[in-house]
UniProtKB/Swiss-Prot annotation:
RMT2 domain segment(s): 1-234
Assigned keywords, A-Z: Methyltransferase, S-adenosyl-L-methionine, Transferase
Pathway note: Amine and polyamine biosynthesis; creatine biosynthesis; creatine from L-arginine and glycine: step 2/2
Quaternary structure annotation from Swiss-Prot or TrEMBL: Monomer.
Family, per entry: Belongs to the class I-like SAM-binding methyltransferase superfamily. RMT2 methyltransferase family.
Enzyme Commission number(s) of this protein: 2.1.1.2
Stored SUPFAM superfamilies: S-adenosyl-L-methionine-dependent methyltransferases
Function: Converts guanidinoacetate to creatine, using S-adenosylmethionine as the methyl donor. Important in nervous system development.
Disulfide cysteine pairs (residue numbers): none
Biological process, per Gene Ontology: creatine biosynthetic process; methylation
Provenance organism: Danio rerio (Zebrafish)
Name this protein carries in UniProt: Guanidinoacetate N-methyltransferase
Enzyme class: transferase
Transmembrane residue ranges: none
């Protein structure tokens, strides 16, 4: 495998066809690919659990954007929450979500569509926790799609005292390969300015690090640490 092959080619955009594209879960259920893109891999589990723990830390009503392999979602369900709303746009993944929802301990509200379509229909001050982990759908938004959601919706949809956590591993893996060797510095320089623009306060943004060992064949992440943000709305 050529390590130099970028995840997105210049100008590439999958958005129009993503919802109909096959969700390719491998037989062992350790990898999910859509349109040949490495969307989710089972080795991410400890990190996904870290994000889920933050998102569910206030209890109440949790919104998750992106269902993937249900790694974070299943962890969210293990906490004493009340409702679990999940936005997912891919048909095959959404079918999995509907099936999974039937056996969960808390009320699950599956919402089908791109977050750009669904989020505007959701009310202000509605969620105690939000976990945003979706796959970038174009080269143009590869490094920035999370900020579009956070600025337009995350801040307004959180209740005061509510918590946001998120990741963009496809972006961060690239930044840590080519631009940064310090994950804290990467987060402070490339993420925090956008969070402040969205209306969050610097003193309400904290992060924790964890050691991780991505498999050598992983196409999107090779750094030995991951970072979990905790962002509280005042």
């Amino acid at each position: 495998m050529s390590a130099a092959q970028p995840i997105f080619s210049k100008g590439e955009n999958c958005k129009q066809v993503w919802h109909d594209a096959n969700a390719d879960y491998n037989a062992a259920d350790t990898h999910l690919e859509i349109m040949g893109k490495p969307v989710m891999e089972r080795w991410e589990t400890p990190y996904m659990h870290s994000l889920a723990t933050v998102a569910a830390s206030k209890g109440g009503r949790v919104l998750e954007i992106g269902f993937g392999m249900a790694i974070a979602a299943t962890k969210v369900e293990s906490f004493p929450i009340e409702e679990h709303w999940i936005i997912e746009c891919n048909d095959g993944v959404f079918q999995r979500l509907q099936e999974w929802a039937k056996s969960q301990p808390h009320k699950v509200v599956p919402l089908k569509g791109l977050w750009e379509e669904v989020a505007p229909t959701l009310p202000d001050n509605h969620f105690d926790g939000i976990l945003y982990d979706t796959y970038p759908l174009s080269e143009e938004t590869w490094h920035t799609h999370q900020f579009n959601f956070i600025k337009a919706h995350a801040h307004r949809m959180l209740k005061p005292g509510g918590v946001l956590t998120y990741c963009n591993l496809t972006s961060w893996g690239e930044l840590l390969k080519n631009k940064y060797d310090n994950i804290d510095k990467m987060f402070q320089e490339t993420q925090v300015p956008h969070l402040l623009e969205a209306g969050f306060k610097k003193e309400k943004i904290s992060t924790t690090l964890m050691d991780i060992s991505p498999p050598s064949e992983c196409k999107y992440y090779s750094f030995n640490k991951m970072i979990t943000p905790t962002i509280i709305k005042e």
